[in-house]
Regions:
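Flexible helix-coil transition and linker loops at the boundaries of alpha-helical arrays
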Residues: 14-27, 62-75, 109-118
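Conserved alpha-helical positions within TPR/SEL1-like repeat arrays
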Residues: 25-43, 73-87, 121-131
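Ser/Thr/Pro-rich low-complexity tandem-repeat tracts
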Residues: 9-12, 33, 57, 81
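Terminal, low-structured helical/coil segments at or just beyond the last alpha-helical repeat
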Residues: 101-137
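Long, intrinsically disordered low-complexity tandem-repeat regions enriched in serine/threonine/proline
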Residues: 1-4, 8-12, 73
Length: 137
């Protein structure tokens, strides 16, 4: 039921985003819909489909972050996408590590600039996930 609801929401958000591509909030909402669909698919055991949804979310967030690099929320959203991909076992370890490092670096940069909200300081979570990965060869 949740997946069907998220897909219905995605269809609406896709329509809105197409109507006004300059509306960054609608673009962000679209990325959130893809992420939520990925979350449900992952729980259902469909890693490859979750990966596809997470990649779509990442693509939207990369576009927003490029469009307005000074927007801390877009950067945090991008870090979240990196975390989702970095913790998805459907990816090879090297790719997971690269996503986790990228996301952690994004958060560190925002924090160093004094723009990371304490509630969004997930650098420790990135470090914990990196520590779980097998050592790089």
């Amino acid at each position: 039921a949740a997946l069907a609801a998220y897909r219905a929401s995605l269809a609406i958000r896709e329509t809105l985003a197409r109507r006004d591509p300059a509306n960054t909030e609608w673009q962000r909402d679209l990325s959130i819909s893809h992420e939520k669909i990925g979350n449900v698919l992952l729980v259902q055991g469909n890693g490859p489909a979750a990966l596809t949804a997470y990649r779509k979310s990442l693509a939207s967030r990369e576009t927003l972050a490029r469009r307005d690099p000074g927007n801390a929320q877009w950067q945090v959203d991008l870090a979240v996408s990196c975390y989702k991909l970095g913790t998805t076992s459907a990816l090879p370890v090297a790719e997971r590590r690269a996503f986790l490092l990228r996301g952690r670096d994004i958060l560190k940069q925002i924090k160093a600039a004094g723009r990371l909200a304490p509630a969004q300081d997930w650098i420790g979570e990135f470090d914990a996930e990196l520590a779980k990965l097998p050592a790089a060869n």
